[in-house]
């Protein structure tokens, strides 16, 4: 996304280089082809302005003129509403609620174990790997019916799942044969131009594109 960062813009994103949820936000920005300045921040080298803007001391922060957002889900929905093309959420309320619920499940069932994967407790790491592998395998059959997660169209749910799938090798997780539909789904995500555009230099090294 270096090319995007070099253009003048009123919108600024502060992100680290490795977190999956920050990557998900960058995917949305790339899908929308937003003119955005992306500042990659190291945890021990935060600019003073970020400390002033974000009361939760987290890095992920979007600034759009006078608006400051620091929750990933709010950022993604704001971007989808602010830049409606291409749409990443359904128009009708029922399907929109369904997709929000799916994102909630992704965060609860998958993202919730990621902190354990970075820990020093070997038992906790092994347990987190098993939970993530089992939960991913459980949703694999859904991709036999539709090209994207419970949908014919690419949505914010897929933007959240793509970073996880990209990091499986980094996490030391190998899907079983029953997870083949999920791996094929991941390959479709990785082939999208916006996905390759969204990668930080560190993320590019996770495995060959």
Feature locations, PLM:
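GST-like domain detector, emphasizing the conserved glutathione-binding G-site
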Residues: 1-134, 140
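Short, solvent-exposed turn/loop segments enriched in Gly/Ser/Thr/Pro and often Arg
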Residues: 16, 156, 202
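A generic structural-conservation signal
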Residues: 38, 152, 177, 198-199
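Conserved beta-strand edge residues that scaffold enzyme active sites
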Residues: 43-44, 182, 203
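Hydrophobic positions within alpha-helical membrane elements
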Residues: 65-66, 163, 197
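GST-like fold's C-terminal all-alpha helical module
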Residues: 106-193
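Long hydrophobic alpha-helical segments typical of transmembrane helices together
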Residues: 185-209
């Amino acid at each position: 996304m270096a090319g995007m960062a070099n253009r003048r813009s009123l919108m600024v994103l502060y992100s680290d280089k490795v977190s999956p949820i920050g990557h998900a936000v960058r995917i949305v920005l790339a899908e929308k082809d937003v003119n955005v300045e992306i500042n990659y921040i190291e945890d021990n080298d935060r600019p003073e302005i970020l400390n002033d803007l974000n009361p939760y001391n987290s890095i992920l922060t979007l600034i759009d003129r006078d608006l400051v957002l620091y929750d990933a889900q709010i950022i993604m929905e704001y971007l989808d509403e602010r830049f409606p093309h291409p749409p990443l959420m359904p128009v009708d309320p029922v399907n929109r609620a369904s997709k929000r619920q799916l994102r909630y499940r992704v965060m609860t069932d998958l993202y919730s174990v990621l902190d354990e994967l970075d820990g020093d407790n070997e038992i906790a790491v092994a347990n987190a790997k098993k939970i993530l592998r089992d939960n991913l395998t459980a949703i694999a059959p859904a991709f036999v019916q539709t090209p994207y997660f419970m949908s014919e169209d690419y949505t914010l749910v897929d933007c959240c799942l793509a970073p996880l799938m990209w990091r499986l090798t980094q996490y030391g997780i190998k899907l079983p044969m029953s997870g083949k539909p999920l791996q094929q789904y991941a390959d479709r995500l990785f082939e999208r131009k916006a996905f390759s555009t969204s990668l930080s230099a560190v993320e590019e090294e996770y495995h060959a594109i």
